[in-house]
Amino acid sequence: MFENTLQGALIGVTVIPTLILSLPTTSFVRYAIYPLPALLVLRALLWPPTEGLAKETYLLGLLMTDTSFKMFDYLYLQGYNAPAKFLQVDRVGRTITKVHEYPKDTLGQVKWALSLVTSHRGIGWNIQVPLQKIKYPSSRVAYIFESMVSILSIYLGLYTCGSLCDYMVQVLRKEADSPYPWVYGLFKNSIFQMVVAFMGIFAMVSNSVLVYNLARMICVTSGIKGDWGKIESWPNMFGGFEDAWSIRNVWGRAWHQNLRRCLTAPGEKVSSLIFGSSPKLGRVPRLIRRYFLVFSAFGVSGLLHSLAVYYGSKTDTMPYEDSTPLHMRPGWYVTGYFFYIQPFAITLEDFICWATGTSTESKGVKATKVRWFVGMVYTLTWFTWGTAVLWIHPQLASLGYQRTSDAELGYVHILVSTSEAASILPLNPWPAVVKTVSPTFWDVYGYFKSSGLGGYLYLYAYTTLEILGGSGFNVLKSASSVV
């Protein structure tokens, strides 16, 4: 029925939980199929797919693992009687103003289950993730316009990222001579390798944001009934860049909160058994509980991402010649290093701020420009280094890729994967825009060239347009002769 166990598990943790939650708690059918999602996930773990491309299997594994963690919370962690734990609510700010009763009719129960399973960050429920103060557009038209601008901006970023990666791949493979020989030398630099790894993360994250923006624009534009058609149900996926002034703030405010519930729920459950109710705790137990939750959340996050690599690392077919044989790869669990180290960094950061009396409140930090700037610099440095060294390198190694199989290829596999990721979603309008603009550019370029103005400025403009136009390096050598 399904091509492999992973695909079956993905269907099992999306469709079946909705059916289970739609049925009365006393239903025999509900009892019968209740363990089925867990069994399908267990089957995928014990008998993972062994054929196919590692990258595709990794992405499918990440999606399945993410969804299964979420459904584990809804179905098993909170107990059999989900309607008693998950409540639809109305809010004004962070205050719950109304609690809706569980529907009595079958159709209402199906809608209730579907709303819970598809809820974004628990919005409209008592499990809603804390949101930053959001200023929503004043009208539906303004909201649609804002979404369109975001979509076009993301498409432009993906197009530019993919084009640059194609450019660098041809340089590394020496498929054409480049007027910029220093580009090849950049890939021997560890810092630039980190930047390249960061581009891969950008492409993957941008695809998620793009899909999210398309979905919210369609739902709000169509005026679909229920929570999906409300503007308030679709806040921006990420916080503001200006809030990335500390490691804790990056994870708590700037980064997306889509997984927050499923990552924190296991720790919350264990801490409630150990510490009891938080308001009743003394200062020291409350502090211990606070950091226990931080460590447990990142522990679950590391496991989630590692399991995705576990599936990808089991595939035999590798798309690059520099692939490492299956028996020589490091363990799939090395991917979790990046996430396991984050709570230690946050704890150290908190201790230093406490010991030096440095403000950790958003208003206090932003009021002092030096404090904000220093925080932004060290945070960006930490994530640029950590993403490459603690995440990308171990993950690629476990999937079979070597960091530098030889001095010439180096990071070519990351660039190829990033380019493919940047072009995976269709309907990108920018290639057509560049193709349309090109004739006009050449006319203007010829005019200024004939007038003797420009120099290297026009060479750079020429090269940029050729890269974005997808013509590669076949014209770059001749471009150097125009100055």
Curated annotation (Swiss-Prot):
Gene deletion effect: Does not lead to any change in metabolic profile of A.oligospora grown on PDB.
Protein's membrane topology: Multi-pass membrane protein
InterPro entries cross-referenced by the UniProt entry: Wax_synthase, Wax_synthase_dom
Description of what induces expression: Expression is down-regulated by the cluster-specific transcription factor AOL_s00215g275. Expression is also down-regulated by the HOG1-MAPK pathway downstream transcription factor MSN2.
Pathway: Secondary metabolite biosynthesis; terpenoid biosynthesis
Gene Ontology MF annotations: O-acyltransferase activity
Function as written in the Swiss-Prot or TrEMBL entry: Acetyltransferase; part of the gene cluster that mediates the biosynthesis of sesquiterpenyl epoxy-cyclohexenoids (SECs) such as anthrobotrisins and arthrosporols, metabolites that possess a novel hybrid carbon skeleton consisting of a polyketide-derived epoxycyclohexenol combined with a terpenoid-derived monocyclic sesquiterpenol substructure (PKS-PTS hybrid). The SEC pathway plays an important role for fungal soil colonization via decreasing fungal nematode-capturing ability. The role of the acetyltransferase in SEC biosynthesis has still to be determined.
Similarity comment: Belongs to the wax synthase family.
Protein's name in the database: Acetyltransferase AOL_s00215g273
Native source organism of the sequence: Arthrobotrys oligospora (strain ATCC 24927 / CBS 115.81 / DSM 1491) (Nematode-trapping fungus)
Organism ancestry: Eukaryota, Fungi, Dikarya, Ascomycota, Pezizomycotina
